[in-house]
Regions:
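Short beta-strand/loop motif that positions the catalytic acidic residue
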Residues: 380-382, 386-389, 393
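Alpha/beta-hydrolase active-site loop
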Residues: 254-291
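Short, surface-exposed "cap/lid" segments of acyl-processing enzymes
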Residues: 183-258
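Gly/Ala-rich beta-loop-alpha elbow adjacent to hydrolase catalytic centers
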Residues: 299-308
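Hydrolase active-site cap/lid region
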Residues: 310-360
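Acidic catalytic loop of the alpha/beta-hydrolase fold
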Residues: 336-337, 352, 391-397, 422-423
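N-terminal targeting or regulatory segments adjacent to alpha/beta-hydrolase or S9 domains
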Residues: 1-175
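C-terminal catalytic histidine-bearing segment of alpha/beta-hydrolase fold enzymes
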Residues: 402-447
Length: 447
């Protein structure tokens, strides 16, 4: 559909305004109720302790919680079978993965059941628990004093355990798991790997890899894995690694929906998230290089782009094998503090007000820039950086993306702009393959 004439109508700023409204007034609030329903484990008393009671709650909530609990149990059983198939004795079959995805999507889709209650008495979009300045200082000040040691890699690629794989369309799909480098995030990190089939693999030798990170709240491992434009690179012989970012999917924090702690915990949550995500991507780069030997690009969309751009500068302090060779950014921004205080999604969810209520000002947030924003030039040449910007992006802010491109002196041939807002910019990849073709040409030349 996006490649048809209808795509010209959809991929416009009006779409982004509508998407923003749906996210802030419906998706995030319903996700808030859903998260507490999952945590309640069927108990109405526990659910009501977390969220205020409503007139219709006594009738609807017990029935909803019963269904949520059944779906949770079904997903747990499917995930146990999945672990046995792909990380245990097997056999690794596509039907096992299809069952896991189906059960996960069925549970995720129960958000809609809370719509009648939300209409009666709106749920909050975020359960705020912003960490105070003294606590953040205590936990992260040493990292701020020594930027060169702020993202120290303590594990090597040997810590990564690959799963069995299965043929899925144009490639062989599998997963990676390894210990999370930051205890505050949780014990386990995950990534999905798509490897080209032998015929496509022979087109590029040694084989390049792209490590591509998703945006906030995007949980393809739970909503349903789709062959998005990025994974189309498999046909060209490029392996694709899709990390499951901290606090998303399998890594979701109890009483939270996917990505919520990044917002709810304030500056402390951002520092923990980027600390873990950056180290994890660096480790995936090293694993990719050790297993195929070809050039490795890192990239991402929105929050994933903010993570990848930080990897690109932090990697100066890492061993050679952990340094990416190229960068692919969709909707990035130079200043995260501006995104938090001025971005339309942040403002629509109440981030600035929550930070200010906890005593955080823009100036105090700016102090932590060296741990949140790219400082200095990327580890790779500007010629190896490809950027896609939406000229009407008011979420990660178009001017922030332009500032990054200018500061890094990215060649004009590597910068692509579309007349779109934040959400439609990423969708534009399905319509215009030029940015990915440019990345492919760079990786081919590097190989």
């Amino acid at each position: 559909m996006l490649k048809s004439a209808l795509g010209d109508l959809i991929l416009r700023p009006w779409f982004d305004r509508a998407a923003l409204k749906i996210l802030t007034t419906w998706y995030f609030p319903l996700s808030r109720a859903w998260a507490e329903a999952v945590a309640a484990e069927g108990s109405a008393e526990r659910f009501f302790a977390a969220l205020p009671a409503r007139r219709r709650s006594d009738r609807l909530v017990p029935r909803i919680l019963t269904l949520v609990q059944r779906r949770c149990e079904a997903l747990k059983a499917a995930e146990e079978a999945w672990l046995h198939a792909f990380f245990g004795p097997g056999p690794a079959q596509i039907d096992v993965e299809a069952e896991r995805l189906s059960r996960a999507a069925q549970l995720m889709g129960l958000r809609s059941l809370f719509a009648p209650l939300h209409l009666e008495h709106p749920f909050p979009a975020v359960a705020w628990r912003v960490e105070d300045k003294a606590s953040v200082e205590r936990r992260h000040s040493e990292r701020l004093r020594e930027p060169a040691r702020a993202f120290v890699q303590r594990n090597g690629p040997e810590a990564i355990e690959p799963s069995r794989g299965f043929i899925n369309g144009d490639g062989v799909d599998g997963w990676l798991r390894f210990p999370s480098p930051v205890p505050a995030i949780g014990p386990q990190a995950w990534a999905r790997v798509g490897t080209p089939l032998p015929e496509a693999r022979r087109r590029l030798d040694p084989q390049p890899t792209l490590v591509f990170a998703h945006g906030i709240g995007m949980e393809p491992e739970y909503w349903g894995y789709q062959r998005e434009p990025i994974t189309g690179l498999l046909q060209s012989g490029i392996r694709v690694i899709l990390p499951e970012l901290p606090w998303h999917g399998r890594r979701r924090m109890a009483h939270s929906y996917g990505g919520e702690p990044i917002l709810a915990l304030g500056v402390g949550g951002l520092l923990d998230f980027f600390h873990a995500a950056v180290l994890e991507i660096g480790l995936l780069v090293a694993w990719a290089r050790a297993t195929r030997g070809g050039p490795v690009a890192v990239g991402g969309v929105s929050l994933g782009a903010l993570t990848a751009q930080l990897v690109a500068t932090v990697a100066r302090h890492w061993p050679e094998e952990m340094r990416p060779d190229a960068l692919f950014l969709v909707a990035p921004s130079q200043a995260l503090e501006a995104v938090a205080f001025e971005g339309s999604l942040s403002c629509g969810l109440g981030v600035p007000g929550a930070l200010q209520a906890a005593g955080w000002t823009l100036e105090e947030t700016t102090r932590w820039r060296p741990l949140l924003n790219p400082v200095g030039d990327p580890v790779m040449s500007p010629d190896q950086v490809v950027v896609l910007l939406g000229v009407a992006d008011d979420v990660t802010l178009a001017e922030g993306g332009e500032a990054l491109v200018a500061a890094w002196r990215v060649p004009p041939a590597n910068v692509f702009r579309c007349d779109a807002g934040h959400f439609s910019t990423s969708l534009a990849l399905s319509r215009d393959g030029a940015p990915l073709e440019r990345l492919l040409s760079l990786l081919s030349a590097l190989g």
